[in-house]
Amino acid sequence: MAKGASISGFPEWLPSERVVEQRVIDTLRKVFELNGFIGIETRAVETGASLLKKGETSKEIYLLSRLQEVGHESDTPIEERLGLHFDLTVPLSRYVVEHSGALAFPFKRWQIQKVWRGERPQEGRFREFVQADIDVIGAGDLPDHYEVELPLVMVSALEELRAYGLPKATVHANNRKLSEGFYRGLGLTDVEGVLREIDKLDKIGADEVARLLTETCGATEAQARACLELAELTASDGAELAAKFDALCEAHGIVKDSEAYTLARQGLDTLAMIVDEAAAIRPGSVIADLKIARGLDYYTGSVYETFLDGAASLGSICSGGRYDNLASQGNRKYPGVGLSIGLSRLVSYMLHTAGAHANRVSPAAVLVAVWNEEDRPAANRIANQLRARGIATDVAPTAAKLGKQIKYADKLGIPYVWFPATAAEGAEGAEPAGDEVKNIVTGEQVAADCTSWEPDTVVAQQTVEI
């Protein structure tokens, strides 16, 4: 990453690092479009009222002000001010409502775009970063099968990135109805508060979460222990999940004919369906993990977190869930389900831990040498002929000594240097009898015609390696 007068949390990739990021973006887009998702881009700003709908605190929102407004921001309510979007879900919900008449539903969209979040920067966490999202939005209703399909699409995309050093990814799924029903069955009423504290489990540990449950959510010690017992449940198939959950309900006196159990069972059935159907298509890719809470209060059903094997310190790299109430227009609701990858964080891991790197900085496969400036038009004609045939080509920036031009190509990783035959009299070195091209990696130099010469496809390709 570029150093110098940097601003904490605002990364700038070096050219070679940008190649890796672009390859990740291209890979994700390819997989998303193979699965029928449509790309969109939304504006960078939303109103404060829209941004606060998701339950974020205003401390994490970057608000915009013109210079002449500095010092007078308090005159305008935060709901009426403009701020940079901190995710892509809030802009999507607004976009769908505004353009509903022009969209076909269910609307399957992918979006890869920068977002801004005013949180404390740390290793792998940024204030400005790229997110990669897929969502499906329905008009009025949305079938449950999308709650299986979306995590499988993300797993498929992450599997493609294993070629660049990414470990195997596993989606951990839960359902908010299951958790809410269980908490209500215990007699707890601050369900949102309990979910927010359970969401901190991996960060602060069970003892601290238990303390917060009793101090902030009104739970007794027994209720707090029961919440933690639920969070410990995992299962790889629906039958195992149902058996473990029913045993826990019985142990804590949650009867099966209660409203709380009925609500929990709705979530359990959906979660079991997700795990079983995912296992039939891609075994081991999705497991039930009842500690997954997603502390944001707009999720209404399935919730997901995605973890990489052997990278526990990285935490979740892809998360999301089902939301039924985020977007509406009059009496019509637009329920959705979506997943989001913190792409910048993922790229940072790939660069600095997995060792992903570009084989060269420049996309050009050929550098056309310039004997002297009078011959630059001829060099440009050769370059244009090669480009017209799909061969990425650059032209030497100056008519420097030939050795310097070759060193320039080498520094950029350009594998071929083209020597034009139309050298002017007095150029350094012997003038070639015709055009020649040199592979500066192997040293091989051969006669070449820009209308027919083909580079070695492996040598010419700009790639990401590990």
Swiss-Prot record:
Compartments, as annotated in UniProt: Cytoplasm
Keyword vocabulary terms for this entry: Aminoacyl-tRNA synthetase, ATP-binding, Cytoplasm, Ligase, Nucleotide-binding, Protein biosynthesis
Reaction equation(s) it catalyzes: tRNA(His) + L-histidine + ATP = L-histidyl-tRNA(His) + AMP + diphosphate + H(+)
Organism domain of life: Bacteria
InterPro entries (alphabetical): aa-tRNA-synth_II, aa-tRNA-synth_II/BPL/LPL, Anticodon-bd, Anticodon-bd_dom_sf, His-tRNA-ligase, HisRS-like_core, HisRS/HisZ
This enzyme's EC code(s): 6.1.1.21
Protein name (record): Histidine--tRNA ligase
Gene: hisS
